């Protein structure tokens, strides 16, 4: 396909970007406490520049050290000592023809008081005693517990307002002096960016952060000149823009990332915050103020799934927002619209939805997708499946001193080593049993190391349990990972044999140097429970895979994990009256909250009943017997059918059989320990890289 617009240059103010692609900011905790870029951070972004992106906006960059921190390891432009390291970073991006844009950020009410208040003290201490940070991360559970109880520091917000869904438990209204100081912090940070050779700055006015908090009537209840009317709510960002223009000049490219619609109506709160019409009005005012481009986004932490979408959201679903903003401004419009393929990107440019296509997750998943599109190698692009592991891992790992990671791209945060992989496996052979995500990741990693690799999958179709997952409502994109892992493994030299089951004896005959067992898991059906094998009992996978259909019946689903919620969707569609029981005290224990919210949004309209802290003790012909996990109280639920969704147990008997023949094998993925697609891929990669 010809990418006439996607690969064409375009100007943002005085800056010419070589193509229409922008990597948007996504924090990954690759920095360090003092806010200077690490080699690892620069390697990470330079690889995206090598891969052809037009402009890179690294993760959020704090504008001061007292109040503006979101993590202990993000970028900062709060001090003059940041200028020289940032200059080095910019030079590395410029080597490959890309532009560097720094996003200036303050979390406001969506910050965590431990990071915003401890950081000033930590910076000088950690410089002298680096291990102090490790000690702090060990205290994270205690600090978060204190924060949840609201008994430690508060964070800044435009006014005393309700708490965000995720963030601090105490906020305080900024004084007028604090507002003025923060405006000056933004301006000074922008000036340092210009001195460092950064090509552009972006003010983060989206996703519910500080600038948006001033713009929104939901969070701005001030009665002075910074609150009340539309013009007053615009004053905070207007004074920042005026100050940047005064210090950096009118030709220095300035972008605002703008939430065009706070999306409260999507989460059942119509009338709260502001909608698209106000978003358009803000955009027009920003153009009047001299902004060079608007980067259109949506929502805030309260409506998390409407800016960090799970896989159920259609690629491009947000393009109407960009098109509406573009209809009222003449400056370039950048937009991230769940962009997943170059074909989609070109199409949205041709439709006039936007001038630049933006994405963070697509560049996280495949740093070279632009170059691959340019060279006609689209089939080699590793597409983001929207599993949200990058978000989950960052938000979880940042609290304990670790980096974020991608479910499918093993190079994240180790680019130098990954792309300089030594082919130390040549003249050695490897057999991989199973072609799910773990088996295919193992195969590609082995092939990249130079092994001669054969993958054997007994089914006629690769994918393992991903086949079931991709069969669920709006989850078909999950199968992309199998298609792309297959392509990657084959391109690196692995041979994949479908419909080929191998016994231990047959494997032994090939005399492999390495054996990887990726035979997946089997759904649990605890035989200790009376009635577990009754005719009215089936497994969740029986329904998801189309082997069984239950209509217009009373059904009890046992287990409220993501699979349990997915099977509930099927049953609701088939007219069933569903009760979900869960032994844990909450629904979907351990599952990432966005995935749970996504499922529950589709389940709630059907009136499904959830019973937590409830153990299954027996199954009769028309009754499910239960026990309260807290009180021991016995109970019963009328039921025509029971669906079990209790997780999986590893299927790895082949490891023992091979051991009896004197062959060592490593179990990966669900064959080693049940988990997510990300768990499967990373366990396989780590296992292969540990082979000497």
Describe each PLM feature range:
Residues 1-433, 437, 442-448, 453, ...:
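Flavin-dependent oxidoreductase catalytic cores
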Residues 329, 352-353, 492, 533, ...:
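Short, structured coil segments at secondary-structure junctions
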Residues 368, 373-385, 500-522:
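Small-residue-rich anion-binding loops in enzyme active sites
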Residues 452-492, 569-614, 672:
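Rossmann-like dinucleotide-binding cores of NAD(P)H-dependent redox enzymes
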């Amino acid at each position: 396909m010809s990418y006439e617009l996607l690969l064409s240059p375009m100007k943002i103010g005085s800056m010419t970007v070589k193509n229409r692609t922008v990597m948007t900011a996504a924090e990954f905790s690759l920095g360090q406490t003092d806010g200077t870029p690490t080699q690892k951070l620069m390697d990470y972004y330079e690889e995206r520049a090598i891969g052809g992106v037009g402009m890179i906006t690294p993760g959020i960059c704090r504008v001061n050290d007292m109040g503006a921190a979101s993590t202990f390891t993000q970028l900062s432009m709060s001090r003059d000592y940041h200028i020289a390291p940032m200059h080095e970073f910019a030079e590395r991006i410029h080597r490959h023809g890309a532009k560097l844009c720094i996003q200036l950020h303050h979390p406001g009410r969506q910050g965590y008081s431990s990071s915003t208040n401890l950081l000033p003290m930590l910076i000088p201490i950690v410089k002298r005693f680096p291990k102090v940070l490790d000690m702090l991360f060990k205290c994270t559970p205690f600090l978060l517990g204190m924060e949840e109880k609201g008994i430690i520091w508060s964070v800044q917000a435009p006014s005393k307002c309700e708490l965000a869904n995720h963030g601090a438990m105490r906020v305080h209204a900024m004084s007028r002096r604090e507002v003025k100081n923060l405006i000056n912090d933004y301006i000074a940070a922008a000036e340092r960016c210009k001195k460092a050779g950064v090509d552009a700055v972006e003010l983060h006015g989206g996703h519910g952060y500080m600038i948006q908090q001033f713009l929104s009537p939901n969070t701005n209840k001030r009665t002075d000149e910074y609150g009340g009317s539309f013009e007053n709510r615009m004053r905070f960002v207007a004074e920042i823009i005026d100050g940047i223009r005064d210090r950096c000049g009118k030709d220095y490219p300035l972008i605002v990332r703008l939430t065009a619609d706070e999306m409260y109506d999507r989460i059942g709160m119509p009338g709260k915050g502001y909608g698209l019409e106000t978003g358009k009005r803000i955009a027009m005012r920003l153009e009047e103020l001299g902004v060079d481009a608007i980067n259109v986004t949506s929502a805030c932490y309260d409506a998390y799934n409407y800016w960090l979408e799970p896989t159920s959201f259609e690629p491009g679903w947000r393009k109407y927002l960009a098109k509406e903003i573009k209809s009222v401004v003449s400056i370039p419009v950048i937009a991230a619209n769940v962009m997943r393929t170059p074909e989609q990107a070109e199409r949205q440019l041709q439709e006039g939805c936007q001038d630049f296509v933006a994405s963070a997750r697509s560049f996280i998943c495949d740093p070279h997708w632009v170059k691959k599109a340019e060279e006609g190698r689209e089939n080699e692009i590793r597409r983001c499946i929207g599993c949200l592991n990058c978000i989950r891992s960052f938000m979880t790992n940042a609290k304990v001193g670790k980096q974020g990671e991608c479910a499918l791209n093993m190079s994240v945060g180790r680019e130098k080593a990954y792309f300089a992989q030594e082919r130390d496996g040549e003249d050695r052979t490897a057999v991989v049993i199973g072609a799910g995500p773990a088996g295919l990741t193992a195969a590609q990693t082995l092939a990249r190391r130079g092994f001669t690799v054969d993958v054997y999958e007994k089914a006629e179709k690769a994918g393992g349990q991903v086949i079931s997952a991709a069969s669920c409502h709006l989850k078909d994109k999950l199968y992309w990972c199998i298609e792309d892992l297959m392509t990657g493994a084959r391109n690196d030299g692995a041979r994949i044999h479908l419909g080929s089951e191998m016994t231990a004896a047959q494997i032994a005959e090939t005399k492999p140097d390495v054996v990887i067992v990726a035979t997946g898991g089997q759904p649990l059906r605890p035989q200790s429970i009376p009635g577990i094998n009754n005719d009215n009992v089936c497994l969740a996978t029986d329904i998801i895979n189309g082997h069984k259909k239950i209509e217009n019946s009373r059904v009890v689903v046992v287990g409220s994990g993501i699979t349990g919620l997915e099977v509930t969707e099927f049953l609701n569609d088939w007219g069933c009256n569903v009760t979900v029981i869960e032994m844990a005290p909450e629904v979907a224990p351990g599952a990432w909250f966005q995935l749970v919210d996504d499922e529950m949004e589709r389940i709630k309209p059907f009136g499904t009943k959830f019973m937590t802290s409830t153990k299954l003790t027996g199954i009769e012909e028309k009754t499910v017997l239960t026990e309260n996990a807290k009180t021991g109280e016995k109970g019963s639920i009328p039921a025509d059918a029971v669906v079990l969704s209790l997780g999986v147990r590893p299927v790895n008997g082949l490891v023992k059989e091979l051991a009896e023949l004197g062959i060592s094998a490593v179990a990966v993925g669900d064959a080693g320990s049940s988990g997510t697609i990300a768990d499967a891929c990373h366990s396989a990669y780590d296992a292969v890289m540990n082979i000497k």
